[in-house]
């Protein structure tokens, strides 16, 4: 879940102070290890001192994990509130990570990165195909030739099956009740998210939207942006995705020349 340009200006401003509590059970360390495994399979291993770009970094949890491993990390996110949380965490941990408030569909960074990552279905928040194409092109321009982009998406099936409809367990610091509705014509899932903070009895509602993209569309957009080859994996495995996959990871290698 994260922070890329959609029709809503900052869907994460309200939840930013509680985001880490909401994601407390997410095994970020295991995610970082899985990403490292995929990068190794692509022939671009993540070493100490690798320059890594964390797209839609949110509160910076993944970026900080890679910084702990010795990487030179830059994290970008559209949400000012999330970036402020990331900067606060980095300062508390004494981590040297550059966090920037930038739009995935409109950023320009020098071609100095070995790897770029974009996790937790952040790219599904790009509701217009042209914005996803621009995000891929911008990322390609920020990568060295042979660098890799590793990202995950919610599959068409995941949004069609309305898997966002869920509640979390009792006794948590942030309670939520989410109801999703998928429109097959627009291919957009609208998720009404009701939150309750028991410690303060604060209650609020936010609306998130995600768009589904087919494997063929993603591969076409990546090719146009200058990525080849492209590999796909069932989430958290190193086997190909299947018809019942809910989340797919892509590993796209930057070709020798940037697309125009």
Locations of regions flagged by a protein language model:
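A short glycine-rich, Lys/Arg-flanked "PGG" loop and its adjoining helix->strand segment in the class I
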Residues: 133-145
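Conserved class I S-adenosyl-L-methionine
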Residues: 1-56
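A short acidic, Gly/Pro-enriched loop at the edge of an enzyme's catalytic core
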Residues: 108-115
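SAM-dependent methyltransferase
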Residues: 145, 150-221
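Residues lining the SAM
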Residues: 119-121
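C-terminal lobe and adjacent flexible extensions of AdoMet/dcAdoMet transferase-like proteins
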Residues: 215-260
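Class I SAM-dependent methyltransferase SAM/SAH-binding core
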Residues: 53, 60-106
